[in-house]
Amino acid sequence: MAETSAPAKATAALKKGALVRVNRHAFSSSTEAAASDPSPPDYIFEGPGELLAVKEGYGQVRWRMPVPDVWLRIDQLEPFS
Protein backbone atom coordinates (compact mmCIF):
# COMPACT_ATOMS: atom_id res chain seq x y z
CA MET A 1 0.00 0.00 0.00
CA ALA A 2 1.37 3.43 -0.94
CA GLU A 3 2.02 6.02 1.71
CA THR A 4 -0.28 9.02 1.81
CA SER A 5 0.85 12.60 2.08
CA ALA A 6 0.26 14.73 5.18
CA PRO A 7 -2.34 17.02 3.50
CA ALA A 8 -4.39 13.97 2.53
CA LYS A 9 -4.41 12.79 6.15
CA ALA A 10 -5.42 16.26 7.32
CA THR A 11 -8.23 16.33 4.76
CA ALA A 12 -9.61 13.10 6.21
CA ALA A 13 -9.62 14.64 9.69
CA LEU A 14 -11.24 17.92 8.62
CA LYS A 15 -14.58 17.64 6.89
CA LYS A 16 -17.25 20.06 5.77
CA GLY A 17 -18.97 21.58 8.79
CA ALA A 18 -15.98 21.15 11.13
CA LEU A 19 -15.00 24.01 13.42
CA VAL A 20 -11.41 25.05 12.77
CA ARG A 21 -8.79 27.66 13.49
CA VAL A 22 -5.53 28.54 11.74
CA ASN A 23 -2.30 27.04 13.05
CA ARG A 24 -0.16 30.13 13.67
CA HIS A 25 3.18 28.43 12.98
CA ALA A 26 2.04 26.74 9.74
CA PHE A 27 0.50 29.97 8.44
CA SER A 28 3.33 32.33 9.41
CA SER A 29 5.94 30.23 7.58
CA SER A 30 3.85 29.95 4.39
CA THR A 31 3.95 31.75 1.06
CA GLU A 32 0.38 32.91 1.69
CA ALA A 33 1.45 34.79 4.83
CA ALA A 34 4.30 36.46 2.96
CA ALA A 35 1.79 37.73 0.38
CA SER A 36 -0.77 38.86 2.97
CA ASP A 37 -1.10 41.54 5.61
CA PRO A 38 1.99 41.40 7.86
CA SER A 39 -0.21 41.22 10.96
CA PRO A 40 -3.11 38.82 10.36
CA PRO A 41 -6.20 39.26 12.54
CA ASP A 42 -6.24 37.35 15.81
CA TYR A 43 -9.66 35.81 15.16
CA ILE A 44 -8.22 33.41 12.56
CA PHE A 45 -5.91 31.91 15.20
CA GLU A 46 -8.48 31.94 18.02
CA GLY A 47 -11.36 30.49 15.97
CA PRO A 48 -13.77 29.04 15.52
CA GLY A 49 -14.36 29.20 11.83
CA GLU A 50 -16.66 26.82 9.99
CA LEU A 51 -15.20 24.72 7.19
CA LEU A 52 -17.63 25.24 4.30
CA ALA A 53 -15.89 23.19 1.61
CA VAL A 54 -12.80 21.06 1.07
CA LYS A 55 -11.30 20.85 -2.40
CA GLU A 56 -7.88 19.70 -3.61
CA GLY A 57 -5.99 20.39 -0.40
CA TYR A 58 -7.72 23.68 0.40
CA GLY A 59 -10.56 24.53 2.76
CA GLN A 60 -13.04 27.39 2.56
CA VAL A 61 -13.52 28.91 6.02
CA ARG A 62 -16.31 31.21 7.20
CA TRP A 63 -15.63 33.14 10.38
CA ARG A 64 -18.35 34.19 12.82
CA MET A 65 -17.73 37.81 11.92
CA PRO A 66 -18.82 40.05 9.03
CA VAL A 67 -15.72 39.26 6.93
CA PRO A 68 -15.34 37.42 3.60
CA ASP A 69 -14.87 33.65 3.48
CA VAL A 70 -11.28 32.58 2.80
CA TRP A 71 -9.58 29.60 1.18
CA LEU A 72 -6.60 28.25 3.14
CA ARG A 73 -4.45 25.16 2.74
CA ILE A 74 -5.76 22.28 4.83
CA ASP A 75 -2.34 21.80 6.44
CA GLN A 76 -2.67 25.32 7.91
CA LEU A 77 -5.96 24.45 9.64
CA GLU A 78 -6.50 22.54 12.85
CA PRO A 79 -9.64 21.41 14.66
CA PHE A 80 -11.05 23.97 17.09
CA SER A 81 -11.21 22.70 20.65
From Swiss-Prot:
Keyword Transport belongs to the record: yes
Enzyme Commission designation: 7.1.1.-
Record InterPro entries: NdhO
GO molecular function, one term: oxidoreductase activity, acting on NAD(P)H, quinone or similar compound as acceptor
Keyword Thylakoid part of the UniProt annotation: yes
Bilayer-crossing regions: none
Gene name, Swiss-Prot/TrEMBL: ndhO
Protein's recorded name: NAD(P)H-quinone oxidoreductase subunit O
Annotated catalysed reactions: a plastoquinone + NADH + (n+1) H(+)(in) = a plastoquinol + NAD(+) + n H(+)(out); a plastoquinone + NADPH + (n+1) H(+)(in) = a plastoquinol + NADP(+) + n H(+)(out)
Localization per record: Cellular thylakoid membrane
UniProt keywords, alphabetically: Membrane, NAD, NADP, Plastoquinone, Quinone, Thylakoid, Translocase, Transport
Xref: HAMAP family: NDH1_NDH1O
Top-level EC class: translocase
Residues forming coiled coils: none
Assembly and interaction partners: NDH-1 can be composed of about 15 different subunits; different subcomplexes with different compositions have been identified which probably have different functions.
Organism whose genome encodes this protein: Prochlorococcus marinus (strain MIT 9313)
Function: NDH-1 shuttles electrons from an unknown electron donor, via FMN and iron-sulfur (Fe-S) centers, to quinones in the respiratory and/or the photosynthetic chain. The immediate electron acceptor for the enzyme in this species is believed to be plastoquinone. Couples the redox reaction to proton translocation, and thus conserves the redox energy in a proton gradient. Cyanobacterial NDH-1 also plays a role in inorganic carbon-concentration.
